């Protein structure tokens, strides 16, 4: 108690106290561990400030530098705050807040003097570890965070180890045990603690917006093929549909202006047409008697509210809805991994009767634009009896004429871009052909629109789920035919049928395929066994997303219903108490076992037998008597000088209390011999 009061007084004065070398070294390593993952989303100078402050603190510990003066600290705080505000794109963004937290952590590290300061720095480390999960929730980051937590906890442990020569490995081992002991209770809270919606929230970052955009210029879809990032994963309740049926509808492009297709507004549309999540809509297609295709999608962050679904989609998940043009949307932008269920009715007919306002919208064309294409369409329509004949003639024209499917189409101007593609370059990607077909159909009065989304995907053989990547981005056309409603037409299948049946790689030329493989991970596909390993790792990440990251209120409710039957607060509370009791019981059992192992130290057993034998002759050890004090009292009884017993006491204390001393056979033999000689001497004197 006196020692604790002395330490508190010294720390209050701010002098004399030195953070243990073991703890400070671990704290330096922990600083690097917790800050390093944030380098991907904060400005580099913040990382540099953190490293500089860490070096400064180490130099202070070695006595080469001094603590910063007050005016220097004020200058550093003001400059850092201004720097964070200026370098951030949004003053109120999560990236800016995280950067400010890291800067504050680094600056506090420099002025750290007392144990209380060290406590604050360590707790800031825990907050910085947790902040990383706001940006990345992958299994790799979770494992990394666990390792970082062990280092931070080891620094915490080091603050309370009084020995001057404690190895860092000892602190790390103790910290690892503490973290592992917390895992069972963490699992109980994760599984059973209610998912309560926050009272307020800020948009979570998901990185730069990637994937399909709300407007498409010629070449935009081709640019997406440069990325093999995952767009979403899909898990089907039954067999996965074949490749040519996997059209994932995302956006509907109805407006064309200066060579760009965009979602645009809805001219002359009746009022009250917005999609309402989870509310019935009068424009839902009739689907009675049609077997649904049920599946769930795990969508990566897009920063937008549009979702991707197979036609014709029916929303199932709360917070999703079907729009008037049969797109699936979420009630809020997708900033984190978003899981939703849907049902597809491929045979359902949409808009058998097309409203006049919608017909006007889907037949609009800019005036005095692409005159050659309009003339071509009207001449072809004059030789066609029905709209179906006209569309078939367009597809036949694409097949027979020298059109080429390529990743690197030539640039087209803003004006007359359809003319330039259809008659001059004849080289394009999916959006070129889909846009041309829609323009030709509208030129002769056939309602048509471009659809943007993804097509195909790769089936993971380990788990059977479908993986759709950014290079699966695709655009196709949708035309309205009398009596048939909206019908999908994909002109890419006419110029490059392998794209629809076998994927993008099979449809490209050798040159384009080489470019694609150099940019994406497909360049590793030829290495024997590597693709199977990548499938295994991807399946692990998928299970993590499905069971851990995607563990939301709906999944928790289903899990509790399967476990408890009727879900009531009482039953959930009982399960949490039982689970928490078992978890804490395991910790208590571990502590009891460790105490037992300490009591069973070979030196402790030898001393205990010695004390028991002396107790039989009237020299019992007192309850509050240390082994050294007891040996000294025994030595007094036999009337010998204290110097004679001192080596034996020192040897016993070193074996019991010094972690750097190993209890070898020779050391134990020496202890037992000394205790035996002392026992014999005392026993003989007692009998005399």
Language model feature labels by segment:
Residues 452, 471, 492-493, 581-583, ...:
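Membrane-proximal, non-transmembrane interaction modules
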Residues 178-269:
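Membrane-interface segments at or immediately adjacent to transmembrane helices
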Residues 275-287, 351, 365, 402, ...:
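Juxtamembrane membrane-insertion context
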Residues 380-475, 596-599, 638:
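Active-site neighborhood of thiol-dependent amide/isopeptide-bond enzymes
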Residues 587-609:
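Transmembrane-cytosolic junction motif
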Residues 81-85, 246-367:
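A cross-kingdom signal targeting lumenal/periplasmic-facing segments of multi-pass membrane
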Residues 1-210, 317-339:
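Linear, non-domain "peripheral" regions
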Residues 67-73, 333-335, 341, 345-375, ...:
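Short, surface-exposed glycine/acidic/tryptophan-bearing loops
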């Amino acid at each position: 108690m006196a020692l604790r009061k002395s330490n508190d007084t010294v720390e209050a004065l701010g002098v004399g106290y030195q953070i243990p070398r073991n703890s400070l070294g671990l704290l330096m390593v922990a600083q690097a561990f917790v800050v390093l993952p944030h380098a991907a989303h904060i400005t580099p100078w913040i990382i540099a400030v953190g490293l500089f402050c860490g070096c400064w603190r180490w130099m202070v510990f070695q006595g080469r530098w001094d603590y910063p003066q007050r005016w220097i600290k004020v200058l550093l705080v003001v400059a850092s705050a201004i720097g964070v505000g200026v370098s951030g794109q949004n003053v109120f963004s999560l990236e800016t807040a995280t950067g400010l937290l890291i800067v504050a952590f680094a600056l506090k590290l420099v002025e750290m003097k007392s144990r209380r300061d060290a406590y604050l720095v360590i707790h800031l480390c825990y907050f910085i570890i947790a902040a990383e999960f706001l940006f990345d929730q992958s299994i790799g980051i979770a494992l990394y965070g666990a390792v970082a937590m062990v280092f931070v906890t080891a620094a915490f442990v080091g603050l309370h180890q009084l020995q001057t020569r404690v190895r860092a490995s000892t602190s790390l081992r103790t910290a690892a045990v503490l973290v592992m002991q917390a895992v069972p209770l963490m699992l109980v809270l994760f599984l059973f603690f209610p998912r309560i919606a926050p009272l307020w929230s800020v948009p979570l970052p998901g990185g730069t917006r990637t994937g399909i955009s709300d407007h498409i210029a010629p070449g935009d879809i081709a640019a997406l093929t440069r990325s093999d990032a995952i767009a979403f994963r899909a898990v089907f309740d039954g067999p996965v549909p074949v490749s040519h049926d996997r059209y994932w509808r995302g956006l509907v492009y109805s407006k064309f202006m200066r060579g760009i297709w965009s979602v645009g507004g809805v001219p002359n549309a009746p009022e009250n047409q917005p999609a309402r999540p989870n509310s019935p809509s009068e424009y839902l297609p009739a689907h009675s008697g049609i077997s649904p295709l049920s599946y769930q999608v795990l969508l990566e962050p897009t920063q937008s509210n549009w979702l991707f679904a197979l036609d014709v989609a029916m929303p199932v998940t709360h917070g999703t809805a079907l729009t008037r043009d049969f797109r699936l949307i979420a009630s809020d932008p997708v900033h984190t991994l978003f899981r939703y269920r849907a049902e597809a009715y491929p045979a359902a007919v949409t808009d058998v009767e097309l409203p006049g306002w919608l017909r006007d919208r889907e037949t609009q064309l800019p005036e005095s634009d692409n005159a050659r294409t309009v003339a071509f369409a009207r001449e072809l329509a004059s030789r066609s009896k029905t709209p179906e004949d006209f569309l078939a003639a367009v597809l036949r024209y694409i097949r027979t004429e020298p059109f080429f499917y390529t990743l690197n189409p030539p640039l087209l101007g803003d004006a007359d871009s359809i003319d330039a593609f259809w008659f001059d370059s004849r080289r394009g990607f999916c959006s070129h052909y889909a846009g041309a077909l829609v323009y030709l159909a509208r030129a002769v009065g056939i309602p048509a629109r471009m659809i943007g989304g993804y097509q195909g995907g790769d089936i993971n053989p380990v788990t059977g789920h479908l993986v759709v990547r950014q290079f699966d981005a695709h655009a196709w056309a949708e035309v309205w035919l009398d009596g048939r409603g909206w019908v999908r037409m994909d002109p890419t299948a006419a110029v490059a049928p392998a794209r629809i049946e076998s994927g993008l790689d099979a449809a490209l030329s050798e040159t384009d395929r080489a470019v694609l493989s150099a940019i994406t991970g497909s360049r590793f596909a030829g290495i024997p066994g590597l693709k199977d390993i990548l499938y295994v790792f991807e399946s692990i990440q998928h299970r993590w997303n499905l069971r851990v990251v995607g563990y939301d209120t709906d999944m928790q409710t289903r899990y509790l219903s399967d476990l408890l039957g009727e879900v009531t607060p009482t039953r959930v509370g009982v399960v949490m108490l039982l689970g928490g009791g078992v978890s804490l019981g395991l910790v208590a059992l571990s502590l009891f076992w460790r105490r037992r192992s300490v009591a069973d130290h070979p030196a402790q057993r030898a001393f205990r037998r010695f004390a028991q034998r002396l107790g039989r002759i009237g020299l019992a050890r007192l309850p509050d008597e240390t082994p050294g004090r007891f040996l000294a009292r025994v030595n007094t009884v036999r009337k010998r000088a204290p110097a004679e017993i001192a080596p034996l006491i020192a040897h016993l204390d070193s074996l019991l209390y010094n972690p750097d001393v190993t209890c070898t056979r020779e050391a134990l033999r020496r202890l037992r011999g000394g205790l035996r000689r002392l026992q014999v001497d005392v026993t003989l004197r007692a009998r005399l």
